[in-house]
Amino acid sequence: MGFEIPEPYKWDESFQVFYEKLDEEHKQIFNAIFALCGGNNADNLKSLVDVTANHFADEEAMMKASGSYGDFDSHKKKHEDFLAVIRGLGAPVPQDKINYAKEWLVNHIKGTDFGYKGKL
């Protein structure tokens, strides 16, 4: 069982990791998934892939630089697996895959990213 998926699907303060850059990037991913719901096309899918890949690179760089986040390899693998899924999609994206992306992001932030709060 995962965390509750917000409706409407948007970032709120319950998703704060308290690193401004990462919170802003999480908002961008929420917005990209929301945009895909409203306009299921190749441009919105590309935007989702791009903002997600950029965020993962930034987050992983912060984790490595901190030297105090002990779950880096597992965290990075989750990023790689999610990117593989969304990079493998074509437009229009099936609704079950949009739902998967929504659920994955919520559960990843609250279940995994929250583990680095105060450590980066």
Curated annotation (Swiss-Prot):
GO terms for molecular function: iron ion binding. GO terms for biological process: response to cadmium ion. Fe cation 1 binds at H26, H55, E59, D113. Keywords: Cadmium, Cadmium resistance, Iron, Metal-binding. Fe cation 2 binds at E59, H75, H79, H108, D113. InterPro entries: Haemerythrin, Haemerythrin_Fe_BS, Hemerythrin, Hemerythrin-like, Hemerythrin-like_sf, Hemerythrin_metal-bd. Expressed and produced in a hematopoietic center that floats freely in the coelomic fluid before being stored in a particular hemocyte type: the granulocyte type 1. NCBIfam families: hemeryth_dom, Hemerythrin. May act as a buffer to control the concentration and therefore the toxicity of cadmium. Also involved in defence towards bacteria growth by acting as an iron scavenger. Belongs to the hemerythrin family. This is Hemerythrin.
